[in-house]
Amino acid sequence: LPVLLHGSHAGLPRIYDIAACMAGRRDGRIDEATVYAFMEAYQSVTPLTMAEVAELPNMLNAALVKLLTLECERALEAENSMETAKSAAAQLERIKERARREAIIDRLSLGEDPVLCECLYGMMKEHDEGIAELINAKLQLEDKSIDGLCAKAAAMRRRSTQRADNVIRSLRCIGGM
């Protein structure tokens, strides 16, 4: 199979790059009509060999499995963020000094991790409103809001779930091609 010499998929078969583009640009949503339209458009510029066309279903499977792997890695990162939030919540509840609580919150970089922020804030709002207010004040210093970060965390979950669902449907579709 012809191999790419440049780009992010250099050294890989050209048909894998096509499959990865199809999978990535459509959030894992691939059906027969998409494949045919994409292939027709691609071949109007650069013809593919018969071997490449025959290998397309396998390469689509590989690209979709890679996309699903990335979603699983994101899910593990979210799980780690939730575990960090639980640990921090327990630590914050044990400590009563405001300065030490602030230091713990500062180390967490809540504004950079919406899942961690959402989880920790939710736990603190339930158990210690003072810490929840402290978290909100720290976020405001960074020009961020708890509502905005919680919305971002929810959007990330929805998109990840949708992408995983798309990949599974696409794998089934390709299996039937």
Where are these regions (language model features)?
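Active-site activation/catalytic loop segments of kinase-like enzymes and analogous catalytic loops
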Residues: 4, 11-51, 60-77
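Helical subdomain adjoining the active site within ATP-dependent kinase catalytic cores
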Residues: 6-10, 72-94, 106
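Alpha-helix initiation/capping motif
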Residues: 13, 31, 71, 81, ...
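A short glycine-rich, hydrophobically flanked beta-strand micro-motif that places a catalytic Asp/Glu
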Residues: 54
